[in-house]
């Protein structure tokens, strides 16, 4: 297979051909990416700096924030840089690295959200045993398993793609290297590979979605026997998580579970999935969480007092 591969680089089409639109993309996505990195860094620093945010929920939130920094960083900086050049070139090795990284951090994000749903289930449905069940060891295992599962998902996607023969053309109708556009360029029958790719990505998204739905149905049924104050806190916490789950899971479910056709909106859906959840997650989890907001205020007060000295 490898001997037939005479493609050393790929040409990315990007989002728009118009130079004016590309300049607009540069401004918008540069701003979005800076806000994403700063917002998630602020969440990580706040959680690690305040002793009041040491519960498992905030441990998983810091893990999610780290994944949310890394996920768009695999594609957006390259896309921003490409707005300055006419020919958007990426090497074969660079393409495979981008493919692996995007699926690694994107997959890990989904598994972390599943771990967070389990944490909320234990906290609400088994409150008396919560600290015993969700100890440091269990949290570390769940987080480690999420990152390992993301790695296994990504390495399968990458190995399936890298072993394909690419004889030309080498033009990818996308703004980054993803599996489906690359399968169309391979000079071999990719039917079985395509099925495995769909099963790998689509079923992970679908299975995670159903696990999360079942978890929250059980949580809602459990809330009926609790006080109105406990219900309010649980709905506030779980509501943030549900919004994030929908933002993260709906685009890949649409992309991989529907029949394999090319839609003009596909690139925009992928872009939404890469850019918007990492950008919005810090807002979603902080605006609805008084503990995080208070911790951030105290952190800024400490910074201000140190600056005055």
Curated annotation (Swiss-Prot):
Superkingdom per UniProt: Eukaryota
Annotated family: Belongs to the G-protein coupled receptor 1 family.
Topology Extracellular: residue spans: 1-23, 78-98, 157-193, 257-267
Principal location class: membrane
GO CC, alphabetical: plasma membrane
Glycosylation sites noted in the Swiss-Prot or TrEMBL record: 6
Stated role: Odorant receptor.
Sample GO molecular function, one term: olfactory receptor activity
Name of the protein in its database record: Olfactory receptor 4S1
Disulfide pattern: 95-187
Pfam families found in the cross-reference section: 7tm_4
Cytoplasmic side: 48-55, 119-137, 218-233, 288-309
PANTHER family on file: OLFACTORY RECEPTOR
Matches recorded under SUPFAM superfamilies: Family A G protein-coupled receptor-like
Upper classification of the organism: Eukaryota, Metazoa, Chordata, Craniata, Vertebrata
Keywords for the protein's UniProt record, in alphabetical order: Cell membrane, Disulfide bond, G-protein coupled receptor, Glycoprotein, Membrane, Olfaction, Receptor, Sensory transduction, Transducer, Transmembrane, Transmembrane helix
CDD domains: 7tmA_OR4A-like
Cell compartment(s), UniProt: Cell membrane
Native source species: Homo sapiens (Human)
Residue spans crossing the bilayer: 24-47, 56-77, 99-118, 138-156, 194-217, 234-256, 268-287
Membrane topology summary: Multi-pass membrane protein
């Amino acid at each position: 297979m490898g001997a037939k591969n005479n493609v050393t680089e790929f040409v990315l089409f990007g989002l728009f051909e118009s130079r004016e639109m590309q300049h607009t993309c540069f401004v918008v996505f540069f701003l979005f990416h800076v806000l994403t990195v700063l917002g998630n860094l602020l969440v990580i620093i706040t959680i690690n700096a305040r002793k009041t945010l040491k519960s498992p929920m905030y441990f998983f939130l810091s893990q999610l924030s780290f994944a949310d920094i890394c996920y768009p960083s695999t594609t957006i900086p390259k896309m921003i840089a490409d707005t300055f050049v006419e020919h958007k070139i990426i090497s074969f090795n660079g393409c495979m690295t981008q493919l692996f990284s995007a699926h690694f951090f994107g997959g890990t994000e989904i598994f972390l959200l599943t771990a967070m749903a389990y944490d909320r289930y234990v906290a609400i449905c088994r409150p008396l045993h919560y600290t015993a069940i969700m100890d440091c060891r269990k949290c570390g295992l769940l987080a480690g398993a999420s990152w390992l599962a993301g790695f296994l998902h990504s390495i399968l996607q990458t190995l399936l793609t890298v072993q394909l023969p690419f004889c030309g053309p080498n033009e990818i109708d996308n703004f980054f290297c993803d599996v489906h556009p690359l399968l169309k360029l391979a000079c071999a029958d990719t039917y079985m590979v395509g099925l495995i790719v769909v099963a790998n990505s689509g079923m992970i998204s679908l299975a995670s979605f159903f696990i999360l739905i079942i978890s929250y149905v059980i949580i809602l049924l459990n809330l009926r026997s609790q006080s109105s104050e406990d219900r309010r806190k649980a709905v506030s916490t779980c509501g943030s998580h549900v919004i994030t789950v929908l933002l993260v899971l709906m685009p890949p479910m649409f992309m991989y579970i529907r029949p394999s056709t090319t839609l003009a909106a596909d690139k925009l859906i992928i872009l939404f999935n890469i850019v918007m959840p990492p950008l919005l997650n810090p807002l979603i989890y902080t605006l609805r969480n008084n503990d995080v907001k208070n911790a951030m205020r105290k952190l800024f007060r400490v910074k201000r007092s140190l600056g005055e000295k």
